[in-house]
């Protein structure tokens, strides 16, 4: 008999999900500190202030995450007075800002809620932070037991973000299908959560093929369409759930593979980190993976 626990994500998606902040966050306290990138905070600040006005949730400060997902920035944030005073953390931005804040939340034992401002990865709901050196070279995955308390996925905000992030996010998403299916091939004794993760990863590919082209066009035109929402769900939620299941033992054997390995290796070259988005390089890595696996079609 196996004994284990799996903690799956909680999330809201739509064009007015910030209205749910008080109901979802207030049981954890009243004081929130927002941590994120400069651009992300600027894009979400007024929405967050408006959504928490005259509620039981008070935003006490907006704090820059430091510019890189690294332990040095986590340690510095832990000493920030507003962070110390807050009951919980609002992580706002892209993957690195969210991963930094998630790691911080574990370090200081405070709840964290995520507010993605771009749809480029599954960081809003995963139980891992990808950590780099201060110079941007991949260092390690930092695993923890539970995902953020809740992810607020505001599609009206996301559809106004640069389309290059959605484009890259699709590459990061379908990589989950190819990497997990290749990594698990031939293994007939996968435990339930690994097998479930592999099956769910199929939804990391199918919606991208079905809705991705239209979603990208709509994102370029800042249209919050059904196709855009379905693509965002695949990028942020489906991939995140698959990731949690595939790394339940905090081992990346089934969750990642050659495509991500290529990206992590290339981060040692400064121009890669400076000029290319994570999912963009991972998408290229998928092509290499398919060639190595002799999937030429």
Which residues does each PLM region occupy?
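ATP/NTP phosphate-donor binding region
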Residues: 1-87
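Active-site segments that bind and position negatively charged phosphate/pyrophosphate groups
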Residues: 191-297
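A glycine/threonine-rich phosphate-anchoring loop and its flanking beta-alpha core
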Residues: 9, 108-201
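Short glycine/serine/threonine-rich phosphate/pyrophosphate-binding segments
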Residues: 18, 41-45, 96-103, 122-125
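Solvent-exposed alpha-helices and their adjacent loops that cap or buttress functional pockets
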Residues: 3-5, 26-27, 82-84, 105, ...
């Amino acid at each position: 008999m196996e004994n284990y626990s799996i903690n799956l994500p909680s999330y809201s998606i739509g064009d007015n999900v910030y209205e749910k902040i008080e109901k979802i966050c207030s049981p954890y306290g009243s004081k929130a500190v927002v941590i994120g990138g400069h651009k992300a905070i600027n894009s979400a600040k007024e929405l967050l202030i408006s959504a928490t006005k005259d509620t039981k949730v008070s935003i006490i400060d907006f704090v820059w995450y430091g510019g890189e997902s690294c332990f040095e920035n986590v340690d510095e944030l832990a000493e920030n007075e507003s962070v110390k005073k807050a009951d919980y953390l609002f992580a706002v931005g892209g993957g690195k800002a969210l991963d930094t804040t998630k790691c911080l939340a574990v370090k200081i034992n405070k709840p964290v809620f995520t507010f993605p401002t771009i749809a480029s990865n599954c960081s809003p709901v995963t139980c891992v932070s990808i950590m780099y050196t201060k110079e941007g070279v991949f260092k390690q995955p930092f695993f923890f037991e539970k995902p953020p308390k809740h992810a607020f996925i505001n599609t009206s905000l996301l559809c106004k973000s640069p389309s290059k992030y959605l484009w890259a996010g699709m590459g990061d998403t379908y990589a989950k299908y190819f990497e997990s299916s290749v990594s698990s091939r031939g293994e007939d004794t996968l435990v339930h959560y690994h097998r479930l993760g592999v099956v769910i990863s199929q939804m990391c590919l199918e919606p991208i093929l079905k809705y991705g082209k239209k979603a990208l066009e709509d994102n370029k035109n800042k249209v919050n369409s059904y196709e855009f929402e379905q693509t965002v769900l695949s990028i942020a939620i489906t991939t995140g759930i698959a990731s949690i299941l595939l790394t339940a033992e905090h081992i990346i054997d089934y969750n990642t593979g050659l495509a991500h390995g290529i990206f992590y290796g290339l981060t040692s070259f400064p121009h890669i980190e400076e000029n290319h988005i994570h999912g963009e390089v991972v998408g290229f890595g998928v092509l290499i993976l398919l060639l190595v696996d002799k999937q030429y079609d």
